[in-house]
């Protein structure tokens, strides 16, 4: 119907006769109008299938919108949409036969004209069918080859190359960990300061006048019942959630504050690389290997020569115990291994503070220990960290201070021993519910 309508449009609008009198142009416009909606829907489905966490992980690495689309979203969406696009191409090939109603020189129409002249109906239609099969088969083989090339699931992980081993061996040995970490004192400068932070989701307040100063080298664990605002608080610290009131200072410089459009100001983009973020759901980029995930942000921001960034990536993977898995894709790794790669990826930008949002909640119990060991090693190295966790024993073991939250408010802040022996009724009730985890503490 659309084809006939466009071909006959010059009868109603004579000004279009020069353009639309051509069967090819009329057929082309009709096919484009008909198929563009289907193809656009296929692309939309591919884009919608990319997990939102991929976007947040890229934002936490200070990747701008264009970079996120080009390097993260579109490559994944294309992999998802490719099979449906191949099917749509076959549909388009079949629909070209409909265009013959307006006398376009389409293969089937040419065949019909031939057998009216030579009277070899079977032979002519057989030749026409061979052409159709050839067109579809060749394209199908090309698409299959492209799918195979894009499919990370069928790739086998390779070992480290001689060049990579040489770069790794040229790196200076890692400094020995402190046998017992030195806790931050009042003399340490404040790295991150939260002043009067408020946040609402609709009419529901989730953060109420939060004030917190995090010193350099300090480890702070945020605990509290589910729904107390812990994750919302840590997400405001690196700009994943906008502020409704208050401000955040990073190294005594403006970092985040409320804006009319809800978007961070230039202060944020100038300093965002100083904050590393590790998510509960890992959010590794599935089309990149473990090493490529770690190298992605430094390469994007041009922090050094490619060989230097490669050496740094290998060193970080060695640090988290995954050097032998450098060329594996995320789906080839266990949950604990993926989370350790995520930690290495966050460390690749050499942040001054690390944020951990329930880093072990999505892991099987037997995988938790390896991730916690990496975090503990970072604490012993003096890394400033804020950890939202339900691992009570771990939180009380490595933290300088414990922050207890409930209903969007900070109810208690103090040293682990002080929190453990607090008389606050709500805190006592919460700790009592965590009694089994806390019995292993030796404070």
Annotate the PLM regions:
Residues 1-164:
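Transmembrane alpha-helices and adjacent helix-loop boundaries
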Residues 238:
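Helix-to-loop junction immediately C-terminal to a conserved catalytic motif
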Residues 255-276, 419-423:
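ABC ATPase NBD coupling module
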Residues 328-331, 349, 381:
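Conserved signature/switch motifs of ABC ATPase nucleotide-binding domains
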Residues 354-357:
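Catalytic Walker B motif of ABC-type/P-loop ATPase nucleotide-binding domains
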Residues 395-397:
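A short, surface-exposed alpha-helical micro-motif characterized by mixed small hydrophobic
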């Amino acid at each position: 119907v659309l084809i006939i309508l466009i071909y006959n449009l010059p009868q109603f609008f004579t000004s279009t006769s020069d353009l639309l009198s051509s069967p090819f142009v009329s057929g082309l416009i009709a096919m484009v109008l008909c198929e563009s909606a289907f193809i656009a829907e296929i692309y939309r489905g591919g884009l919608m299938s990319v997990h939102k966490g991929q976007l947040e992980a890229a934002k936490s690495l200070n990747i701008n919108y264009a970079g996120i689309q080009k390097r993260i979203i579109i490559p994944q969406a294309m992999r998802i949409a490719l099979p449906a696009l191949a099917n749509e191409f076959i549909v388009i090939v079949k629909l070209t036969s409909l265009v013959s109603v307006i006398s376009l020189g389409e293969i089937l129409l040419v065949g019909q004209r031939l057998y009216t002249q030579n009277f070899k109906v079977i032979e002519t239609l057989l030749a026409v069918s061979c052409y159709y099969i050839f067109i579809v088969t060749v394209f199908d083989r090309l698409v299959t080859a492209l799918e195979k090339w894009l499919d990370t699931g069928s790739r086998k992980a390779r070992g480290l190359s001689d060049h990579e081993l040489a770069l790794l061996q040229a790196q200076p040995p890692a400094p020995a960990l402190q046998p017992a970490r030195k806790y931050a004192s009042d003399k340490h400068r404040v790295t991150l300061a939260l002043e009067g932070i408020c946040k609402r989701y609709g009419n529901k307040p989730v953060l109420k006048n939060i004030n917190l100063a995090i010193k350099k080298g300090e480890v702070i664990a945020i605990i509290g019942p589910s729904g107390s605002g812990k994750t919302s608080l840590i997400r405001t610290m690196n700009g994943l959630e906008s502020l409704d009131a208050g401000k955040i200072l990073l190294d005594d410089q403006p970092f985040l504050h409320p804006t009319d459009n809800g978007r961070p100001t230039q202060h944020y983009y100038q300093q965002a690389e100083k904050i590393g973020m590790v998510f509960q759901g890992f959010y590794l980029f599935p089309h990149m290997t473990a090493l490529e995930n770690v190298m992605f942000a430094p390469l994007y921001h041009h922090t050094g020569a490619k060989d230097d960034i490669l050496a740094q990536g290998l060193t970080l993977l060695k640090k988290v115990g995954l050097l032998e898995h450098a060329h594996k894709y995320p789906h080839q790794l266990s949950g604990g291994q993926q989370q350790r790669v995520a930690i290495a990826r966050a460390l690749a930008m050499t942040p001054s503070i690390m944020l951990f949002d329930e880093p072990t909640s999505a892991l099987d119990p037997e995988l938790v220990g390896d991730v916690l060991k990496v975090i503990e090693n970072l604490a012993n190295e003096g890394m400033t960290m804020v950890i939202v966790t339900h691992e009570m024993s771990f939180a009380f073991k490595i933290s300088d201070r414990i922050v207890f939250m409930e209903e969007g408010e900070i109810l208690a802040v103090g040293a682990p021993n002080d929190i453990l022996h607090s008389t606050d009724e709500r805190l006592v009730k919460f700790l009592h519910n965590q009694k089994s985890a806390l019995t292993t503490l030796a404070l």
